[in-house]
Each structure stands twice: as structure tokens, then as C-alpha cells.
């Protein structure tokens, strides 16, 4: 049997904190009324249809790369502003920020904002499964950024943005643009897909 003193060490504390943040985010999302899984009753590893009521309801979709990008960007930002913090604590902070975003993104105000200014007319918020998967995609991006050379991280960001812009006419940059400063020309271009 593993001793609790071995499992809960000073070195493992940030990873337990990261895990706890993810669990608390999932519980909060359930508490505010988010569906645990897609109301269609199934769980898919991949759902590639963006103009669908099942979008943002399954494990991965075309918006998953945006969350990987979050991880890459959070790693770079925390490396710059908190270089003395351990990798584990920087990961915990990044997970807290990503979890906070998932909670805000799934608030009624933001859901209505998406529906009002973007082409996401069928968007009713993420399932809890999708939100947790998005957080884990951010963790993946964070770990990749720690292991890869800077040029590779930059290439991933550019590649994912180019890929999603080309295939679904959306991505992290366009999503932020349309949420904060909606442009009718962009909305029309996205709707023409």
C-alpha cells in the first residue's frame, strides 16, 4: 500500500492542485446546470460538425486545437512573468485560468453573446465532458510547450490557426475577434461555408 505521505509531497502538491481545480470546475459546471454529456445520449471521441447542436458536447471537436493553443500561450506567459515558479505550479495556475474561462464561457451571458454575434446559432454551452476535455487539451499544450523548442510551439499555433480557419472558418483568433469586436464581414464569410 502506498503511504499517503508519499502521495502527498511538496513536489506533488501542484499536480494535486491542478487535479482539484479540474474537479471543482466540473462540479461548478454541473451545479450551474451544464449537461454532463451530450443530450443526444452518446459520447463521441470526435465530433467534426460545427453547425450542429452536438458541437462542443463531445470529447474533441474543431475547437480543441484552440485549447491546445491556450496551453502553449499560458506556458510562454508564465515562463515570462513567473520564471522561478516550478513547472507544476505554473501548470496549476494555467489550469485555474483555463477552468475560469470554461466557467465564464458557459455562463448565460457569454452563451447569449456567442449566439448574438457569431454564426454559432445552435450553441447552448459546452457539456461538462467537453469542458473538462478542453481543460485537458490546454494541459497538453502546456506540456508540449515545456518540451518543444520555441519554434515548434510557434509552428503549432500558426498551423492550428491556419487549419481551423481554412476548414471551419473559425479558430482562436477569429473567436476572440467575434466575441469582443464582431464584424459583419467576418460573420458573413463564416456563414458562407
UniProtKB/Swiss-Prot annotation:
Matching Pfam families: DUF2585 (PF10755)
Predominant place of localization: membrane
Highest taxon of source: Bacteria
InterPro entries: DUF2585
Segments crossing the lipid bilayer: 13-33, 62-82, 148-168, 172-192
Keyword annotations: Cell membrane, Membrane, Transmembrane, Transmembrane helix
Subcellular location(s) of the protein: Cell membrane
GO CC terms in record: plasma membrane
Membrane topology: Multi-pass membrane protein
Protein family according to the UniProt entry: Belongs to the UPF0314 family.
Protein name: UPF0314 protein Pden_1914
Amino acid at each position: 500500500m502506498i503511504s499517503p505521505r508519499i502521495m502527498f509531497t511538496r513536489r506533488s502538491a501542484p499536480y494535486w492542485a491542478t487535479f482539484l481545480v479540474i474537479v471543482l470546475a466540473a462540479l461548478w459546471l454541473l451545479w450551474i446546470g451544464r449537461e454532463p454529456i451530450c443530450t443526444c445520449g452518446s459520447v463521441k471521441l470526435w465530433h467534426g460538425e460545427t453547425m450542429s447542436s452536438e458541437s462542443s458536447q463531445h470529447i474533441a471537436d474543431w475547437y480543441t486545437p484552440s485549447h491546445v493553443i491556450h496551453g502553449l500561450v499560458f506556458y510562454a506567459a508564465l515562463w515570462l512573468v513567473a520564471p522561478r515558479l516550478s513547472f507544476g505550479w505554473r501548470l496549476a495556475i494555467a489550469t485555474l485560468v483555463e477552468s475560469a474561462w470554461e466557467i465564464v464561457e458557459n455562463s448565460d451571458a457569454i452563451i447569449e453573446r456567442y449566439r448574438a454575434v457569431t454564426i454559432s446559432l445552435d450553441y447552448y454551452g459546452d457539456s461538462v465532458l467537453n469542458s473538462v476535455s478542453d481543460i485537458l487539451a490546454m494541459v497538453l499544450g502546456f506540456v508540449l510547450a515545456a518540451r518543444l523548442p520555441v519554434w515548434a510551439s510557434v509552428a503549432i499555433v500558426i498551423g492550428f490557426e491556419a487549419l481551423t480557419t481554412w476548414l471551419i472558418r473559425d479558430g482562436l483568433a477569429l473567436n476572440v475577434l467575434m466575441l469582443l469586436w464582431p464584424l459583419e464581414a467576418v460573420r458573413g464569410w463564416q456563414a458562407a461555408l
